[in-house]
A protein has these predicted regions:
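Short, small-residue-biased leader/transition segments that mark boundaries at the very start
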Residues: 1-4
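N-terminal glycine-rich anion-binding loops that anchor highly charged ligand groups
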Residues: 10-28, 259-266
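Alpha/beta enzyme core
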Residues: 15-26, 52, 66-157, 166-175, ...
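Glycine-rich, proline-tolerant flexible connector loops at the mouths of alpha/beta enzymes
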Residues: 31-43, 130-136
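Generic beta-sheet signal
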Residues: 34, 61, 108, 128-129, ...
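Glycine-rich nucleotide/cofactor/substrate-binding loop typically near the N-terminus or early
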Residues: 38-82, 229
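Conserved active-site-proximal phosphate/metal-binding subdomains
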Residues: 144-158, 164-302
Length: 302
């Protein structure tokens, strides 16, 4: 079927590896391996592993600022990965190679201008991600970004940012989207390999518990509030330099995801963390979102 119509799992660095991606695809979604800052060898190993865990399509997210982006781009083509999502940069130079490998390319965009540019480059779809999302974010909310991107391009638009249940799923379609991508909800699943402390912090989070750090650096990041974000925001308000701020967050995501240090690490999560109330299986999450979403869409205004 149409890959955009599946619930897509966000390709989150350090979080989205073969186990999670395969579990999502096996559950009827589209699993994504997040290359993040990893090297090409790791990405290739994860692709090979995912293929042993699922016979369903899955994708890879490539951060184009990764020093090994060129090598990773070749790896996904070599293994005929079904879908590539991209962030932080322009995938134009890889398009021909990817198209020849039969890959569908879906860049993540945070503005109308970016969406138009990606369509011109030959993207098959775009993922319009609102500022509600976790990790690196743009400025515009999903609610206003999605319909504007839908109006601006002639390719399918996937909505992302703030979606965690069937209500968000249904709303995305009402805004003109052809599919949804969820990140935070999938981090808090049984099959996700992040540390239990990380999952617990997402489940415990309330509506106001995310903070955006790094606005002054031009690279804002949404995390769950903790000791690290408090220190960072204090330094930032005092006009601290880039070097000092970067030192604070260096290896922060690894600290939280792998070591489970959710006080001093970077617990990246979206505002939808407030909607996540339990840790369930990928299958349960996807089924629940689909069932609730379809009920709402068929009900209309009644």
């Amino acid at each position: 079927g149409d890959v955009y119509k599946r619930q897509i799992q966000g390709g989150m660095a350090w979080v989205a590896e073969a186990n999670l991606a395969a579990a999502v695809s096996n559950a009827g979604g589209l699993g994504i391996i997040g290359a993040g800052g990893a090297d090409a060898k790791w990405v290739e190993d994860q692709i090979i592993k995912a293929k042993t865990l699922t016979d369903k399509p899955f994708g890879v997210n490539i951060m184009l600022m990764n020093p090994q982006a060129d090598e990773i781009a070749k790896v996904v083509a070599k293994h005929n990965v079904k879908v590539v999502t991209t962030g932080a940069g322009n995938p134009g130079k890889y398009m021909e190679m990817w198209k020849n490998a039969g890959i569908k390319v879906m860049p993540v965009v945070a503005s109308v201008a970016m969406a138009r540019m990606m369509e011109r480059c030959g993207a098959d779809a775009v993922i319009a991600e609102g500022t509600e999302a976790g990790g690196h974010i743009g400025e515009i909310t999903t609610m206003v970004l999605v319909p504007q991107v839908v109006d601006a391009v002639n390719i399918p638009v996937v909505a992302a940012g703030g979606i965690a249940d069937g209500r968000g799923f249904a709303a995305a379609f009402m805004l003109g989207a052809s599919g949804v991508q969820m990140g935070t909800s999938f981090v808090a699943t049984k099959e996700s390999t992040v540390h239990d402390n990380y999952k617990a912090k997402i489940v415990k989070a309330k509506d106001i518990d995310t903070k955006v750090t790094g606005r002054s650096t031009g690279h804002p990041v949404r995390n769950l509030r903790n000791k690290q974000t408090n220190t960072y925001l204090k330094l930032e308000s005092e006009g601290a330099g880039l070097e000092q701020l970067e030192k604070l967050t260096l290896g922060g995501l690894r600290k939280a995801v792998v070591d489970g240090d959710v006080d001093n690490g970077s617990v990246m999560a979206g505002q939808s963390a407030g909607l996540v109330k339990e840790i369930c299986s990928c299958k349960d999450l996807i089924t629940k979102v689909m069932t609730q979403g379809e009920q709402l869409l068929s009900k209309g205004f009644d």
